[in-house]
Amino acid sequence: MNSPEKKFITVEDPVEYRLPRINQVQVNAKIELTFGRVLRAALRQDPDIVLIGEMRDQETAEIGLRAALTGHLVLSTLHTNDALTSAMRLIDMGVEPFLVATALNAVLAQRLVRRVCENCMEDHQATARELVWLENLLGQSLSGRTFKRGTGCHHCHNSGYQGRVGVYELLEMDDLMIGALRRNDPQGFAEAAKLNAHYRPLAACALDYALAGVTSVEEVLKVCATLTDEGVE
């Protein structure tokens, strides 16, 4: 993506890393150099790729989405729990549903979970309550499955964990999801996403790592709890 043939402009607050071959602009509210103002100026430079540090308001979101309709690749971030709620969040910000449905191609959500320490790793059986909760959420049987956990050692400072790994949820728009967005139908959008063969929720990705012994069931439950606003006791 970052090649000499491509013109790449970023709008950030703040610019944290200097990147080669990329024109980076930092917004500054004190002099009214807002995301919207910088974006309008950036688009007049005919960029191939535009990175918006964050879509914080309706103006920024609308400019970014309209830029995507005119041949620019636009990348940005939103503060949401998962990929499903990201698309609807744009509409909640005041962007017209038809614009979101037309311009949005994909949403990638990500979280970090802790890795089980390999130096003190041991087998662990989840409680019946935890298994039922996960099975109901993910729709798959976990009976008889063994997980891993760390008992704590000097390598991990007795935490049982060492390092982190990313869990991801990629949502690529299809006709059913686009139709639900046009109707501003959150429930229909969620149902359409679940029918997409390529869609896997964050919790399922986290569970894959737990079943592979990379992370613990406790870390999976943390991810699930933030997605459902409830926990397991």
Regions found by a protein language model. Name each.
Residues 1-233:
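Short, flexible helix-loop junctions that flank or precede catalytic/ligand sites
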